[in-house]
Design a protein with these regions (language model features):
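Iron-sulfur cluster-binding cysteine motifs and their immediate structural context
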Residues: 1-7, 17-33
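Long, charged amphipathic helices and adjacent flexible linkers at domain junctions
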Residues: 33-44, 201
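Switch II (G3) loop of P-loop NTPases
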Residues: 50-55, 64-89
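Short, surface-exposed connector motifs at secondary-structure boundaries
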Residues: 73, 96-100, 120-128
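Structural beta-sheet core signal
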Residues: 79, 101, 129-131
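Inter-motif core of Ras-like GTPase G domains
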Residues: 86-107, 113
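C-terminal lobe/tail of nucleotide-utilizing enzymes
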Residues: 119-201
Length: 201
């Protein structure tokens, strides 16, 4: 009696585990476009590398890894990871020397922060926290961070000017000199906490 193997492509993670597990060599690989990587150069000379998954692709991790191939070992590279603790976050955090967790002082924000911290502790990563929209919630998140000894790198207040400038596609640091100083100071704090790594990303 013939036996058939059905591969559910929509659920495929492209890990190759089924290929290795099938002792009859009944499964073969094929090329598939998972996404695209685009590279942009800013007037300042900095590069932006964007990885964009194709519609319907279950796991964006291969696209993230593809984008990472275009980073340079010299200088500093910033990885922008998605929220949550799913595979894309882990794939991004795993290659970073230091992680900046952005949260909000709300019960929901604290819950997500605890999950992220637990994940990063498992990965043995160094990290600090930036509190966005500070002043809107209670003190629970501050008390928890103090209890855990986790550094607060900066607090960004709830500011309508930030929302307005962002909605116009501009950077608040380019419009408001005060925020330029704010983010410059944040950068210095991150460098101080990250230490002198041989390859800072």
């Amino acid at each position: 009696q013939a036996k058939h193997i059905q591969v559910l492509e929509d659920l495929c993670h492209d890990c190759g585990a089924c290929l290795a597990a099938c002792k009859y060599n009944a499964i073969t690989e094929k090329e598939k476009t998972l996404g695209h990587v685009s590279i942009y150069r800013l007037p300042s000379g900095a590069l932006i590398v964007e990885g964009r998954s194709s519609i319907g692709v279950y796991s964006p991790v291969p696209v993230i890894k593809g984008a990472m191939h275009h980073t340079h070992p010299d200088g500093i590279t910033l990885f922008d990871a998605p929220p949550g603790i799913s595979c894309p976050f882990i794939a991004t955090a795993d290659k970073a020397d230091y992680i900046v967790l952005v949260t909000e002082p709300t019960p929901f924000g604290l819950n997500d922060l605890k999950l992220s911290v637990q994940t990063l502790d498992t990965l043995q990563k160094s990290y600090g926290v930036v509190i966005n929209r500070s002043g809107l919630g209670d003190n629970s998140i501050y008390e928890w961070l103090e209890e855990k000894g986790i550094p607060i790198l900066a607090e960004i207040p709830f500011d309508k000017e930030i929302a307005r400038v962002y909605s116009e596609g501009r950077l608040i640091a380019e419009v408001n000199p005060g925020y330029r100083y704010f983010f410059t100071n944040l950068y210095r704090k991150i460098r101080n906490h990250a230490g002198n790594c041989s390859s800072q990303r």
